[in-house]
UniProtKB/Swiss-Prot annotation:
This is Doublesex- and mab-3-related transcription factor dmd-3. Disulfide bonds: none annotated. Transcriptional activator which promotes male-specific development. Acts partially redundantly with the transcription factor mab-3 to coordinate tail tip cell fusion and retraction and thereby regulate male tail tip morphogenesis. This is most likely through the regulation of downstream effectors such as eff-1. May also negatively regulate the expression of other proteins implicated in male tail morphogenesis including nhr-25, vav-1 and arl-1 in tail tip cells. In males, plays a role in the development of ray A-neurons by negatively regulating the activity of the transcription factor ast-1. Residues 90-100 have a biased composition (Polar residues). GO terms for molecular function: metal ion binding; sequence-specific DNA binding. It is found in: Nucleus; Perikaryon. Residues 90-115, 166-201 are annotated as: Disordered. Residues 102-115, 169-180 have a biased composition (Basic and acidic residues). The keyword Phosphoprotein does not apply. Belongs to the DMRT family. Keywords: Developmental protein, Differentiation, DNA-binding, Metal-binding, Nucleus, Repeat, Sexual differentiation, Transcription, Transcription regulation, Zinc. Induction: Negatively regulated by lin-41 which causes degradation of the mRNA encoding this protein. Its main location: nucleus.
Length: 250
């Protein structure tokens, strides 16, 4: 019996994994045949150090298993050990992009991932992780392999937090870029006022220049002849003359 028959969920679909170092710096490069050409191969930032540390822990697990059994790690144990790392990468990739890199879709629904308990895996026992934490027989195990598993899980949790933070930052950046476009498409209050007041000015009664000059001249002449005379409101007089303007039909 081969590994495909033992764990068909690991080989049921072709998955595409991306370089974790490049993801730390906002790039998406396929992991296959990428190691030697990776731009961040020797990067020593805190995020890339987490990636390297997790790889060291995986190597440490293999060394412990090989030294105890005095034989290479079994295929089953290797698959269970590597599955957690692959599942974490699937989770981090799906958190970073909307494209599903670690899960296939069937009828528009994402395929459910079913991770195994890594503590049990180190003791050659297969148990599904969901609802298993409190009932795990190796919950309080302090063997070297379980201690490495605990440290690796902490690193993986930190990396998932990093991917989620990167996703939030990317979404915020996209929102800031879309905001000016939406604002430019929204009519401003000034334009609205101009649009609403323009018809009013066009429909208002046009002022007759001849009648206005006559009213002003009449008022000036009357003030010269009798300065003590009390005049009514000039605007009322002007509006009365304009309303009876004989030049409207000209």
């Amino acid at each position: 019996m081969n590994i495909e028959e033992i764990l068909p969920e690991l080989f049921g679909e072709k998955r595409v994994y991306y370089c974790q170092r490049c993801l730390n710096h906002g790039l998406r490069e396929k992991r296959k045949n990428h190691k030697l050409s990776c731009t961040f191969r020797f990067c020593q930032c805190s995020n890339c150090i987490m990636v390297e540390r997790r790889r060291q822990l995986n190597s440490r697990l293999m060394q412990i298993d090989g030294s105890r059994d005095e034989k290479p790690m079994t295929t089953l144990t290797m698959a269970l050990t590597c599955s957690e790392e692959d599942q974490m990468e699937c989770t981090s990739q799906s958190e970073t992009t909307n494209e599903s890199s670690g899960e296939d879709k069937d009828d528009g629904k994402p395929k459910e991932r079913r991770p195994n308990c890594q503590r049990c895996a180190q003791h050659s026992v297969v148990n599904r992780l969901k609802g298993h934490k409190r009932a795990c027989p190796f919950r309080d195990c302090f063997c070297a392999k379980c201690q490495v598993v605990v440290e690796r899980q902490k690193l993986m949790a930190d990396q998932i937090k990093l991917r989620r933070r990167q996703k939030r930052e990317k979404n915020n950046l996209n929102s800031e870029r879309e905001a000016p476009i939406a604002h430019s498409m929204t009519p401003s209050p000034i334009d609205t006022v101009t649009t609403t007041t323009t018809p009013t000015s066009e429909t208002s009664t046009p002022m007759c220049l001849k009648c206005a000059q006559q009213v002003i001249g009449y008022q000036q002449l009357l003030s010269l002849l009798d300065p003590s005379a009390t005049l009514q409101d000039p605007m009322i007089t002007l509006s009365a003359v304009l309303s009876a303007c004989p030049h409207k039909n000209e």
